[in-house]
A protein has these predicted regions:
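Amphipathic alpha-helical regulatory segments at dimerization interfaces
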Residues: 2-8, 61, 65, 90-91, ...
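Short amphipathic alpha-helical segments
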Residues: 2-7, 13, 59, 160-164
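GAF sensory/regulatory domain recognition
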Residues: 3, 14-55, 76-77
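Signal-transducing coupling segments at domain and membrane junctions
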Residues: 58, 67-68, 72-99, 121-129
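Signal-transmission/dimerization alpha-helices at domain junctions
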Residues: 61-68, 115, 137-156, 169
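Regulatory loop-to-helix N-cap segments in sensory/regulatory domains
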Residues: 96, 111-113, 119-142, 149
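A short, aliphatic-rich beta-strand micro-motif
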Residues: 98-107, 114
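Histidine- and acidic-residue-rich, metal-dependent catalytic cores
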Residues: 159-175
């Protein structure tokens, strides 16, 4: 889902974050710029990022408000925005985030399961440009598929947990 979304809108990077209690944690991260620099077998360093769900950071803002954000330049946010761009992830990964579209992953009841974040749309010359309205529609379409995948994963996980719990109650003498 993330790969196809990025391909359709021609974005360099992206992530899927999942809500875990009061935090939002990156589950899938892709970055074509960094992928080219990795040695064989080496993985991207994004799996360690986790943020509190609040309106101070972009992912937390989208997860807490349920509103998508289309940001032209993360380093040039107006002073009056309630959220800020966390430069630490760029510093830690030696990357330069500019344009970003962040979309909430909501189920049918409106519960936020996670966030889809697409980063650095590229033009035909490889320059970073802003995401447009058409990109927003495409990303929203793929977000629906991401929600379905997350819901399926949650249901499967819950079913396995129930089966394990039921197995604990089984009397081994009965078999």
């Amino acid at each position: 889902i993330l790969t196809e979304t990025r391909r359709i809108v021609n974005a360099d990077a992206g992530s899927i974050y999942v809500v875990e209690e009061d935090r939002i944690k990156i589950k899938y991260g892709q970055n074509d710029t960094h992928l080219k620099e990795l040695a064989p077998g080496e993985k991207l360093p994004y799996s360690c990022f986790s943020f509190p769900i609040n309106e101070k950071q972009i992912c937390g803002y989208v997860a807490s408000t349920g509103k998508s954000l289309n940001i032209k330049d993360c380093y040039a946010l107006p002073e009056d925005t309630p959220y800020k761009f966390n430069k630490n992830s760029d510093i830690m990964t030696n990357y330069r985030t500019k344009s970003m579209y962040t979309f909430p992953l909501k189920n049918a009841t409106g519960q936020i399961l996670g966030v889809l974040q697409i980063i650095n749309k590229l033009d035909e010359n490889g320059a970073v440009i802003a995401f447009d309205e058409e990109d927003e529609l495409f990303i929203g379409h793929f977000a629906v598929s991401a929600v379905q995948a997350l819901q399926h994963a949650y249901l499967t996980s819950n079913m396995v947990k129930r089966m394990l719990k039921m197995a604990e109650f089984r009397d081994p003498k009965e078999t």
